[in-house]
Amino acid sequence: MDGRISGSTQLLGLIGDPVAHSLSPAMHNAALAAMGENYCYVPFPVAPKHLAAAVAGLAAIGVRGFNVTIPHKQAILPLLDQIESRAAAVGAVNTVYPLPEGGWAGTNTDIDGFVQPLLGLEKGIPTLILGSGGAARAAIQGCLELGLGPVRVAGRSPNSLLALQQTWPQVETVNWAELNCYLSQTRLLVNTTPVGMHKPGSPAGQGLSPLSREQLGLLSPGAIVYDLIYVPDPTPLLRMAAELGHTPISGLEMLVHQGAKALSLWLGGKPVPVEVMRQAAQHQLAQV
């Protein structure tokens, strides 16, 4: 698309609350322009009480697909006509597409985005995931699909850890106070907690890290440290990891690749310019 909207322009979008700071519109519209596709990706702020009406409305106006972000990733499940098995396992949907017979299907491209930077890793790498919330569920599913393991999850909520083990019995859960015992065995560390995130307009979170430098020093030499946070870039966790000789991976990779997977799905499997999406996201981040 050349930037001009016509009567035949197709709509894609994002629903969430809020959506003002999302990088997705910049990423998707840059890719669509580079591909010459007559589509426009629009963010739609949708309050929880309006979710059902919004999902029906998007179908009514012929939207060709949409992403789902906080706080709707779980709440949207009963509103969909079909849910892919991996999304059902994770208990969350972030990408919705229309079924040929009508209605909506949901999948979870967060899993695809998460695994992309890890493709090529040997199987059986001991993995420790920090956090037991929704992001941890996508990370667990991704690690298991890659054949990594043992996969351990460290969290502070016994109930959340129990729920994870009920979904994935092969995953070992660890009380946060005991995680130091497992660091020396860890070759892949994944942070799914929000600790260290910088929110626009607020200094809170700057300088924070879920693990100390001393704890990072206990990791297996040359470990991979993957922080799902991408603001600031690098995060304190990744900066310290790099200084200690570990391999850092930014959460921006997950964001870009989940978006690319979703866009390809909406466009019938066409290849998507990932680098264009990455550059658009980085440019948008530089404005924050």
From Swiss-Prot:
Q: Which GO terms describe its molecular function?
A: NADP binding; shikimate 3-dehydrogenase (NADP+) activity
Enzyme Commission designation:
1.1.1.25
Query: Which residues does the annotation say bind shikimate?
Result: S22, L23, S24, T69, N94, D110, Y230
Provide the binding site for NADP(+): G131, S132, G133, G134, A135, L228, G251
Catalytic reaction list: shikimate + NADP(+) = 3-dehydroshikimate + NADPH + H(+)
Q: In which pathway does it act?
A: Metabolic intermediate biosynthesis; chorismate biosynthesis; chorismate from D-erythrose 4-phosphate and phosphoenolpyruvate: step 4/7
Q: Record's GO cellular component, any one?
A: cytosol
InterPro entries per the UniProt record, alphabetical:
Aminoacid_DH-like_N_sf, NAD(P)-bd_dom_sf, SDH_C, Shikimate_DH-bd_N, Shikimate_DH_fam
Catalytic center at which residues? K73 (proton acceptor)
Q: What does this protein do?
A: Involved in the biosynthesis of the chorismate, which leads to the biosynthesis of aromatic amino acids. Catalyzes the reversible NADPH linked reduction of 3-dehydroshikimate (DHSA) to yield shikimate (SA).
HAMAP family linked: Shikimate_DH_AroE
Q: What is this protein called in UniProt?
A: Shikimate dehydrogenase (NADP(+))
The organism encoding this protein is Synechococcus sp. (strain JA-2-3B'a(2-13)) (Cyanobacteria bacterium Yellowstone B-Prime)
Q: Which gene encodes it?
A: aroE
